[in-house]
Regions:
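Short hydrophobic/aromatic beta-strand micro-patches
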Residues: 36, 55-57, 107
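A broad, low-specificity signal marking well-ordered, structured residues that form hydrophobic/aromatic
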Residues: 33, 52, 102
């Protein structure tokens, strides 16, 4: 099983200074990016499939969209494929609080510890 938590965290820190493994309880400082590994399963002897969920929280719709676009650029640049995203009309979750969740998937070559680009 491949553990890519630290690599994903370092990648997301290039987008936002406030990155956590999961959303903390109580009041939080925004913007905030949270990430969690949703699945990490072997495909066969040579490959694992990893799935991530990235949650982006911000004060305004424009800010959440800008952060989502930056996350998308970084994750797809690493070779992950976006498999789902929160629709725009469901992103306003409270007074001055916007949330978009983005799901990513990738096939990982275990021998070389690399992402197989374009795989889902």
């Amino acid at each position: 099983m491949i553990d890519a938590r630290e690599q994903v965290k370092e990648l997301l820190l290039t987008v936002c200074d406030n990155v956590k493994m999961s959303k903390p309880d109580g009041d939080v400082e925004l913007p905030l990016i949270c990430y969690t590994e949703r699945s990490n399963l072997p495909v066969n002897i040579a490959y694992d499939r990893i799935q991530w969920r990235v949650a982006v929280y911000a004060n305004t719709f424009e800010e959440v969209i800008n952060l989502v676009n930056a996350v998308e650029e970084k994750m797809t640049g690493l070779g992950f494929t976006r498999t789902a995203v929160t629709p725009d009309d469901e992103s306003h979750i409270g007074t001055d609080l916007y949330l978009k969740r983005i799901d990513y998937s990738a096939l990982i070559n275990k021998e070389y510890n690399t992402v197989v680009k374009g795989s889902v």
